[in-house]
A protein has these predicted regions:
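Conserved AAA+ ATPase core "coupling" helix
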Residues: 1-58, 62-70
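Generic serine detector
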Residues: 11, 23, 35, 53, ...
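Short hinge/gating elements
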Residues: 12, 46-57, 76-81, 126-133
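Short amphipathic alpha-helical segments enriched in hydrophobics
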Residues: 30-33, 75-76, 150
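Amphipathic, well-packed alpha-helical segments that form the structural scaffold of globular domains
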Residues: 69-73, 119
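C-terminal engagement/docking regions of AAA+ P-loop ATPases
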Residues: 77-153
Length: 153
């Protein structure tokens, strides 16, 4: 059911690979079969937990929490939505913003971090209904409008 989508942190828009990339994917899988399925681990559990702790330790100021709240409130005010932004989505946006800040080596979460990740966090949560009359045709266009109308700290 669509409300279950709220449990996913991000929505990733994937397209089909081009011909050359698809061929490489097939070759990788063919080689993997030849090696009896021995898969190389990219990261172990301890390293993953350590990285998660570092991401959660990235500071989020009260001002950034207000900005995230303002974005969520702006999304909730849209009329004609089938589904909108929950409290869980606000937490997801904060955590994803911390991850972006960590990956960008920022000392704290900045508005640019939030703006960079709000699309993947909101896109599967904002479902436009048939009666939606917001002048946009997709959730990604709506997110752009929400970003434009929300004051940046």
């Amino acid at each position: 059911p669509e409300p279950q989508l709220d449990r996913f942190l991000l929505s990733v828009n994937m397209t089909l690979p081009d011909r050359q990339t698809q061929s490489k994917i097939l070759m990788l899988h063919a080689e993997q079969n030849e090696s009896n399925g021995a898969e190389e681990k990219l990261i172990n559990v301890d390293e993953l937990v350590r990285l998660q702790s570092k991401v959660k330790a990235v500071p989020v100021s009260e001002e950034m929490c207000q900005y995230i709240t303002d974005l969520c409130e702006s999304a909730r005010r849209q009329r004609g939505m089938l589904h909108s932004i929950s409290a869980r989505a606000a937490i997801a946006l904060m955590r994803a913003s911390q991850a972006v800040a960590y990956l960008e080596d920022n000392p704290a979460v900045f508005p640019e971090d939030v703006k960079r990740i709000v699309g993947p966090v909101f896109s599967h949560r904002l479902v436009l209904g048939d009666g939606f009359d917001g002048g946009v045709n997709s959730s990604s266009e709506l997110i752009e409008e929400i970003l434009k109308e929300t004051k940046v700290p």
